[in-house]
Amino acid sequence: MKINNLILLFFIGLVPLQSINAAEYRLGLSMHDVERRIEGGAAISLEKIFDRPNWWHPYAGRPHIGTHLSTANNTHLLYAGSTWNLFQKGKFSGELAFGAAIHSGQEDIKKDQLGFGCRVNFREMIAFGYQIRKDQLLQVSAQHMSNGSLCDPNQGLTSVGIRFAWKIN
């Protein structure tokens, strides 16, 4: 799946969510594939986290949709899921996210190439943040995408980086 298709899917995915108020946007820069270093370079991420709609289960966190784009044109992700606040202590906070990701990488493991087993995988993220202003947050985050051994063997993809978040409403 080419990067243009992933970007198009990201914006198409936002259309049905327009009725949900946006809580915040996040822009990030991360080291891509820190675990195996088969795919090097940086990745840029863009994420939109929504306020929890009335019909959303109260324990399901806040819905999010985002993309993770490799600057070296390796594996790109389009993902969606839920984000939970773990703690808020003064200006410090923590959060956890879980959902699904569609990737542009290979499914089979090959020499010098990551393989992810199936096209759609699980995606988890943990982040710790510092509130710069009332509507701005700086986070250190780590995300991992893997199929959880539900399909063919996979190597997973782990990225670590920083994100800037700003609240809209």
Describe each PLM feature range.
Residues 1-23, 169:
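Cleavable N-terminal export/targeting peptides
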Residues 11, 45-47, 81-83, 127, ...:
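Outer-membrane beta-barrel architecture
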Residues 19-23, 51-61, 87-94, 135, ...:
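Short loop/turn motifs that connect adjacent beta-strands in outer-membrane beta-barrel proteins
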Residues 24-33, 58-71, 142-146:
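Transmembrane beta-strand segments that form the barrel wall of outer-membrane beta-barrel proteins
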Residues 29-32, 38, 55, 94-125, ...:
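Outer-membrane beta-barrel translocator/channel fold
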Residues 32-42, 68-78, 88-90, 149-155:
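Solvent-exposed loop/turn segments connecting transmembrane beta-strands
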Residues 44-46, 132, 156-169:
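Outer-membrane beta-barrel "beta-signal"
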Residues 52-86:
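Short, well-structured hydrophobic secondary-structure segments
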